[in-house]
Amino acid sequence: MFGISFSELLLVGLVALLVLGPERLPGAARTAGLWIGRLKRSFNAIKQEVEREIGADEIRRQLHNEHILSMEDEARKMFAPNQPSENSPEPANPPPAPAAAEAASPVHNQAAHHEIGPAQPAAPKTELSLEKTAKPADAGTPVPAPPAHDSSLPPRAP
């Protein structure tokens, strides 16, 4: 606090021991400690009172808030050209809603519409080749969406 090193403090202690003697030195050290504590407390109280009077806390808060607001404005200016406006029109191609509705329908309701009858024989196995089934699509023509439910398959259990 005062820039006193250990050697200087030791020198002051030795001089006090020689001047006061071993009987009065502990009482003098205790009294000096109490006075130093009182001085510190009174100095801190005066410092807080002065800060309260001049409104240093309010000034600090105001400066801090102004700094934050200026940073927000700079950030808005930086990001404003990159972000689309909130009043922009909807995209021209909305996602297909009917396909999503068909896919979301429960499977057990479809099973209720099918009649349960005698077992039918399985269809004969046929060989498939990729050459016959896969044809490349043109880039300009849209590809039709696959059906949501293949009616040739038996219903799934819930």
From Swiss-Prot:
Biased composition (Low complexity): 80-90
Pfam family, one: TatA_B_E
Any one GO molecular function term: protein transmembrane transporter activity
Residue ranges of the region described as Disordered: 73-158
Keywords on record: Cell inner membrane, Cell membrane, Membrane, Protein transport, Translocation, Transmembrane, Transmembrane helix, Transport
Subcellular location(s) of the protein: Cell inner membrane
Keyword Membrane attached: yes
InterPro entries the UniProt entry points to: TatA/B/E (IPR003369), TatB (IPR018448)
GO biological process: protein transport by the Tat complex
Segments crossing the lipid bilayer: 1-21
Gene3D superfamilies the record matches: 1.20.5.3310
Family designation: Belongs to the TatB family.
Annotated function: Part of the twin-arginine translocation (Tat) system that transports large folded proteins containing a characteristic twin-arginine motif in their signal peptide across membranes. Together with TatC, TatB is part of a receptor directly interacting with Tat signal peptides. TatB may form an oligomeric binding site that transiently accommodates folded Tat precursor proteins before their translocation.
Quaternary data: The Tat system comprises two distinct complexes: a TatABC complex, containing multiple copies of TatA, TatB and TatC subunits, and a separate TatA complex, containing only TatA subunits. Substrates initially bind to the TatABC complex, which probably triggers association of the separate TatA complex to form the active translocon.
Identification of the protein by name: Sec-independent protein translocase protein TatB
Species this protein is from: Pseudomonas syringae pv. syringae (strain B728a)
Gene that this sequence comes from: tatB
